């Protein structure tokens, strides 16, 4: 069972809880979602609790993360977008931490679960809709009407824009889920090659060198992907929030 590359993604109950026929069990996914949030909050707290004029390593990382997301928001949604800084920064840190924790052996990668990434995507799109209608009323619907479109093409373009908007939570969630899933499966397969060949003795050890090199290279690549996927999620969030702040601006 452990040789199955998809076994690492199975949801397993830790504390079974059932109320009124509804399963509220505490699972490995629940544990590592809580762990991801706790690690992110804990790191930021300890990194900034003893702030110094000349920052140490942890304070530098925390400040760089803050400035990174702040600049991203200003570029993607303008200065008004800074009101959403807590949301975007929290999402970025959670996704990044969850991705990185999933790189450790026997740890669970919560971002490889479509239900988790879809919930995050729904949070983003829900925020866009709620703020858009709250701030602009029905003028928010201008987001579906690009400027400069000939009247004869307007119905078709509006239909395309609506479909594109409705597909955003799907594309946002599937992109993160698929990349993390595929990367971890590939790592598991190459690591399995190394273990299987190594068990054959001296001849197998020689043949395991190439898969081992590939595994090390893929591990390094997966750490890069872990950051890039958090970055892409945050960038797209900023772009979608820009539609809520400036509807009809495209």
Swiss-Prot record:
Q: Which family does it belong to?
A: Belongs to the ATPase A chain family.
Query: Which Pfam families does the annotation name?
Result: ATP-synt_A
Keyword Glycosyltransferase on this protein?
no
Q: How does it assemble?
A: F-type ATPases have 2 components, CF(1) - the catalytic core - and CF(0) - the membrane proton channel. CF(1) has five subunits: alpha(3), beta(3), gamma(1), delta(1), epsilon(1). CF(0) has three main subunits: a(1), b(2) and c(9-12). The alpha and beta chains form an alternating ring which encloses part of the gamma chain. CF(1) is attached to CF(0) by a central stalk formed by the gamma and epsilon chains, while a peripheral stalk is formed by the delta and b chains.
Record's GO cellular component terms: plasma membrane; proton-transporting ATP synthase complex
Give the location in the cell. Cell inner membrane
Question: Which membrane topology describes this protein?
Answer: Multi-pass membrane protein
TM stretches of this protein: 29-49, 84-104, 114-134, 143-163, 193-213, 216-236
Specify the protein name.
ATP synthase subunit a
Give the originating organism. Answer: Rhizobium etli (strain CIAT 652)
Sorted alphabetically, the keyword list is: ATP synthesis, Cell inner membrane, Cell membrane, CF(0), Hydrogen ion transport, Ion transport, Membrane, Transmembrane, Transmembrane helix, Transport
Extract the PROSITE patterns matched here. Answer: ATPASE_A
Q: PANTHER family from the xrefs? A: ATP SYNTHASE SUBUNIT A
MF GO annotations: proton-transporting ATP synthase activity, rotational mechanism
Function per UniProt:
Key component of the proton channel; it plays a direct role in the translocation of protons across the membrane.
């Amino acid at each position: 069972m452990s040789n199955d590359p998809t076994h690492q993604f199975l949801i397993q109950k830790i504390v079974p809880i059932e109320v009124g026929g509804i399963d509220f069990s505490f699972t490995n996914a629940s544990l590592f979602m809580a762990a991801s949030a706790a690690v992110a909050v804990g790191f930021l707290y300890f990194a900034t609790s003893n702030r110094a004029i000349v920052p140490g390593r942890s304070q530098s990382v925390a400040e760089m993360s803050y400035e990174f997301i702040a600049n991203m928001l200003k570029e993607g949604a303008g200065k008004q977008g800074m009101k959403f800084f807590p949301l975007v920064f929290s999402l970025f840190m959670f996704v990044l931490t969850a991705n990185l924790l999933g790189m450790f052996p026997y740890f669970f990668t919560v971002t490889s679960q479509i239900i988790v990434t879809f919930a995050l995507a729904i949070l983003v799109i829900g925020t866009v809709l709620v703020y858009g209608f709250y701030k602009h009323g029905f003028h928010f619907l201008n987001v579906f009407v690009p400027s400069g479109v000939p009247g004869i093409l307007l119905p078709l373009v509006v239909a395309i824009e609506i479909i594109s908007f409705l597909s955003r939570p799907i594309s946002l969630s599937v992109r993160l889920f698929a990349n993390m899933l595929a990367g971890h499966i590939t790592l598991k397969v190459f690591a399995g090659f190394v273990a299987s060949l190594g068990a054959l003795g001296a001849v197998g050890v020689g043949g395991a060198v190439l898969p081992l090199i590939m595994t090390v290279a893929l591990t390094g690549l997966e750490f890069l992907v872990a950051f890039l996927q958090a970055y892409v999620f945050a960038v797209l969030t900023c772009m979608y929030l820009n539609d809520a702040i400036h509807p009809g601006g495209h």
